[in-house]
UniProtKB/Swiss-Prot annotation:
It holds the Pfam family PhoU. It comes from the Archaea. This is Uncharacterized protein MJ1011. It comes from Methanocaldococcus jannaschii (strain ATCC 43067 / DSM 2661 / JAL-1 / JCM 10045 / NBRC 100440). InterPro entries: PhoU-like_sf, PhoU_dom.
């Protein structure tokens, strides 16, 4: 027996919220690793990235399947399209976290990375998601 559409949307809401929290943690870890010059933290961010991206892609596919299966209209259609768009935005934020880590791992210079703009970027991103 197929699930009700509302149950599927609620399940996707919970998943996207958990993924958003995980991405924020990863971004904060990346900024912390960059500012403290700890390459092991940046390696952890890159390691976690694969799992996060897989979860985002599976959620996006699940949304597309629900779109095809239930053929929603109006409000329900907007809900699904919003979830698909959020997956894309969260993926971009995760890519930024990984790029920050790659910058540290590929840099050959040790300089003061305690940049207030990097920390501000992380806090603004966190505010946007929450």
């Amino acid at each position: 027996m197929p699930k009700k559409f509302d149950d599927i949307v609620n399940e996707m809401d919970r998943k996207i919220e958990l993924l958003g929290e995980e991405i924020i943690k990863n971004l904060n870890l990346s900024v912390e690793g960059y500012c403290t010059n700890k390459k092991d933290i940046c390696n952890l961010v890159i390691y976690k990235n694969n799992n996060i991206i897989k979860n985002l892609e599976s959620l996006e596919m699940y949304s597309v399947k629900a779109l095809c299966l239930y053929r929603p209209v109006s409000k329900d259609l907007r809900k699904l399209l919003t979830i698909i768009k959020l997956c894309s935005m969260l993926e971009k934020i995760e890519e930024c976290a990984v790029k920050i880590s790659f910058v540290l791992l590929n840099s050959k210079f040790n300089f003061d990375r305690n940049d207030k703009y990097i920390k501000r970027m992380a806090s603004l991103t966190e505010e946007i998601i929450y």
